[in-house]
A protein has these predicted regions:
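Short, surface-exposed helix/turn micro-motifs that flank interaction/cofactor sites
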Residues: 39, 99, 122, 126-129, ...
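Short linear Ser/Thr-Pro motifs
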Residues: 79-80, 116-117, 203, 226
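Generic beta-strand structural signal
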Residues: 85, 97, 111-115, 123, ...
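Canonical Radical SAM [4Fe-4S] cluster-binding loop centered on the CxxxCxxC motif
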Residues: 105-143, 149-150
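Conserved AdoMet/S-adenosylmethionine-binding subsite of the radical SAM
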Residues: 152-325, 329-331
Length: 354
């Protein structure tokens, strides 16, 4: 059986985006000057690139001739009552992606950015609006880094020390692993924004081959698994990827991840009314987790309804029973408070050009 994610998503051709280049890339391309210095100024002082006070004219002219110095364009910003902002960004080829800027609810300058890895998504999850788009193309590393730079410039925070990144926007990050990982290399580089990989989370629908590859890479972000079902039958009906990598194969890959990395996982579980929110589902979830339930977080996410799916959010009673049952069984449980639901910016609601 062939699946959309068996083939690489389309890539773009042309001059490399300057913000997606490492110091080694700059050196290999023949950039004049010290490549580490040029990289540092690109990442930290990008808003001044046209009249950059810390780069020579020779370097600026070389960058203009040999690279693409553009960032995504902020086409529209929708502001939620809860303080979050959905940003619709336009890319060089006219494609649109969405990013969500979420300040912490307490009085602090800390911000979480929910960023995208692809235009569309090949996974086809029935509860996710992005899946209804299909896959258009991968984002380049510079377009991923560009989301962060642009949002820092327009909405903050002013310092990357106050920033947390989650690859939970449009796309399956592990279907675009090379560009996603290169972006993480750049964002965490000590001469760049220097964002710790421990403040970067990659969420996957369960692309086992990508999980295995990511476990061998450095720097390595935190990993979240979009689980959402306790039987192969239900998971395959709502998440087609389960037909390629079933729950048993996924669990084996996660055991290997933990053995290799010794890092905690987050299990995301979107609760859908009448689909996966029963008392029996809670017991099966605890059983599937086994010993993992004591140390690894189960993050319950009430379904965020949207026009691309018929799935409904659970009742408050079923959510409370489900979470209480898991806790009684020894699971470490959190319930996500969805941000930006009033502007269609919550988990599973990001979509363009449907």
């Amino acid at each position: 059986m062939n699946f959309a994610w068996d083939q690489p998503a389309p890539e773009r051709k042309g001059r490399p985006n300057a913000f997606g280049l490492t110091p080694e890339d700059l050196e290999s391309l023949g950039c004049p000057g010290r490549s580490q210095h040029v990289f540092s100024q690109l990442q930290r002082q990008w808003q001044w690139i046209e009249e950059h006070p810390f780069l020579s004219k020779e370097v600026r002219y070389w960058l203009e001739d040999h690279t693409d110095l553009s960032l995504p364009i902020l086409s529209q910003a929708l502001h939620s009552e809860d303080g979050s902002t959905k940003c619709i960004l336009s890319l060089n080829d006219g494609e649109l992606i969405e990013v969500v800027h979420m300040p912490r609810e307490v009085k602090t300058s800390r911000v979480t950015l929910c960023i995208s890895s692809q235009v569309g998504c090949a996974m086809g999850c029935t509860f996710c609006a992005t899946g209804a788009m299909g896959i258009k193309r991968n984002l380049e590393s510079g377009e991923i880094v560009g989301q962060v730079l642009l949002l820092m410039k327009t909405l903050g925070p002013k310092t990357p020390d106050h920033l947390t990144l989650v690859f939970m926007g449009m796309g399956e990050p592990l279907h675009n692993l090379m560009n996603v990982h290169k972006a993480i290399q750049i964002l965490s580089h000590s001469h760049g924004l220097n964002i710790s990989p421990k403040r970067i989370t990659v969420s996957t629908s369960g692309l086992v081959s990508g999980i295995e590859r990511l476990a061998r890479m450095t720097p390595r972000p935190l990993l979240a698994i979009s689980l959402n079902a306790t039987t192969d039958e239900v998971r395959s009906s709502s998440m087609p990827i389960n037909r390629a990598y079933n729950l048993s194969q996924l669990r084996h890959a996660l055991d290997s991840w933990i053995l290799k990395t010794n890092e905690k996982l987050t299990f995301e579980y979107v609760l859908m009314r009448g689909v996966n929110d029963s008392y029996l589902d809670a017991h099966r979830l605890s059983e599937w987790l086994g010993e993992l339930r004591h140390q690894h977080n189960v993050n319950l996410i009430p379904m965020n309804e949207h026009r691309a799916s018929d799935q409904k959010e659970p009742s408050r009673e079923s959510l409370e029973i489900f979470s209480r049952t898991l806790r009684d069984l020894g699971c470490f449980v959190t319930v996500r408070k969805s941000r930006g639901r009033d502007i269609q910016a919550a988990c599973g609601q990001l979509i363009r050009n449907l």
